[in-house]
Regions:
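C-terminal catalytic histidine-bearing segment of alpha/beta-hydrolase fold enzymes
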Residues: 191, 198-275, 287-296
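Primarily recognizes the serine-hydrolase "nucleophile elbow" in alpha/beta-hydrolase
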Residues: 118-120, 126-174
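A domain-start/cap signature at the N-terminus of enzymes
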Residues: 14, 26-61, 112, 252, ...
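Short solvent-exposed coil/turn linkers within tandem alpha-helical repeat scaffolds
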Residues: 209-215, 275-291, 295, 331-371, ...
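Active-site machinery of serine-nucleophile hydrolases
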Residues: 62, 66-119
Length: 431
């Protein structure tokens, strides 16, 4: 068994001692000593879910969840139904954070959970899983690389690593589950990462869901744990359950067929390809291969490929232009007007396409707008406020409000600007 200290040292130079278990308040169920405890435990640092059939006599897989704002309960609830059904312990951090000035914040958050998991539960040290969203998705992959051979899978939502795929090249014991909302501003980044995984022959899945930059719904999160269980069988981490594998294959073939019949050809092809990768050779896999090949010969599928390629190119172009536009705005001697900034960002055209475009162009425009909104309503105003440039910060927030009403962090930044530099004319407002 690998000691706590060995695992901890591999995830950062900072060393500390924590006694987490004593802080947990138990409310029902059974703990490792067979005493009355909770299946949903909570401490100051994390929430825990333990399956009701937990028994310390065997080893259990565990999922560590890193929410980008430390919303432990929200994130844990998404995985809880599948964790109960499939037998996963889930720990969800209250200390994880994206966009932090502290580079070690997620190292500490993860190590806190890792220490507690080894101290308090009987876990399978070869079946550690990590789930992250946005910036914490990138952290999850980096931790998996450092703990290769221990981390058996990563759920990466709404963001992707810039590398790391070759650390797991041809590794059947590792699984990469990627997901993104259809209007997520990091949508293309997530797709590109799975292409790199495919090239490196890393087992992967890619799922899209309706919505913006966010955690997926419960069914997608549960699907990730189901797939991890399947990959654990295929990778030799657990004994193969032929009945469960056959049942899972049945459901996936039915789902792929349903996607095709509803006109979701690209989704059907993607699932058929995943089926072909994830199951041992059998006559039923030939069904998937033939069905996928038939779709790929259809003219409408070829047209879809061409159009999505064009839209991806446009997305990439905008992602490269946006920093240059921001640089122009920040360095102009006279603060550019809201109209001038909006024109450079092509907001009028993008807003029109987002409401009047077709099923491909509308989501593509919404993704670009979402990326622009994140920059104008959070990242850049925060930086400008730190630099004391309140006029430019307010102007950026004004343009952001043309994309969508200011909420949450955008409102907090606007209030900070107005507090430190009261507006002398009409200013943007919060919804």
């Amino acid at each position: 068994m690998v000691s706590n200290m060995n695992l901890r040292r591999r995830l950062g130079k900072t060393r500390w001692h924590l006694v987490v278990g004593a802080a947990i308040m138990w409310v029902g169920g059974r703990d490792v000593n067979g005493q009355t405890s909770t299946t949903a435990a909570r401490s100051a640092d994390f929430d825990v879910y333990v399956p009701t059939r937990y028994d310390a006599k065997r080893r259990w897989p565990i999922l560590f969840v890193l929410d980008p704002r430390g919303r432990a309960t929200v994130a844990l609830e998404l995985f809880k139904p599948a964790a109960e059904q499939l037998g996963y312990i889930v720990m969800s951090s209250r200390r994880s954070l994206s966009d932090s000035n502290d580079p070690d914040v997620n190292v500490r958050a993860f190590n806190t959970m890792l220490d507690a998991a080894q101290s308090d539960y009987s876990i399978d040290l070869h079946r550690l899983y990590i789930a992250g969203f946005s910036g914490t998705a990138r952290a999850a992959v980096s931790f998996a690389v450092e703990l290769r051979g221990r981390v058996a899978g990563v759920v990466a939502v709404g963001a992707a690593p810039t590398g790391g795929e070759f650390a797991f090249a041809r590794d059947s014991t590792f699984a990469y589950f990627a997901a993104a909302g259809e209007t997520d501003f990091n949508h293309e980044e997530v797709v590109a990462a799975t292409e790199r995984m495919r090239s490196a022959k890393v087992p992967y899945r890619l799922e899209f869901f309706p919505g913006p930059h966010s955690w997926p719904p419960t069914d997608v999160c549960g699907g990730a744990l189901e797939w991890f269980t399947l990959r654990a069988m295929r990778g030799g981490l657990v004994p193969t359950d032929s009945g469960r594998m056959a049942s899972h294959l049945d459901r996936e073939l039915e789902a792929a067929d349903a996607r095709e019949k509803s006109g979701r050809l690209a989704d059907a092809v993607r699932l058929y390809a995943a089926i072909s990768r994830d199951y041992p050779p059998s006559p039923r896999l030939e069904i998937a291969r033939k069905a996928s090949a038939a779709i790929e010969r259809r003219p409408e599928y070829a047209a879809w490929l061409r159009r999505t390629s064009e839209l991806m190119d446009r997305d990439l172009k905008q992602s490269r232009e946006l920093p240059e536009i921001v640089k122009w705005f920040r360095t102009e001697r006279n603060v550019p007007s809201a109209d001038a900034l909006g024109d450079r960002l092509k907001l009028t055209d993008l807003l029109r396409q987002s409401t009047q475009g077709d099923s491909l162009s509308a989501p593509a425009a919404m993704r670009i707008l979402a990326r622009t909104l994140a920059v104008l309503s959070f990242y850049e105003p925060r930086s400008l406020i730190d630099a004391g440039d309140f006029t430019r910060a307010r102007r950026m927030l004004e343009v952001a409000a043309r994309i969508a009403p200011l909420r949450g962090e955008g409102c907090a930044l606007l209030n900070e600007v107005n507090r430190r530099d009261p507006p002398r004319e009409a200013a943007p407002s919060c919804s």
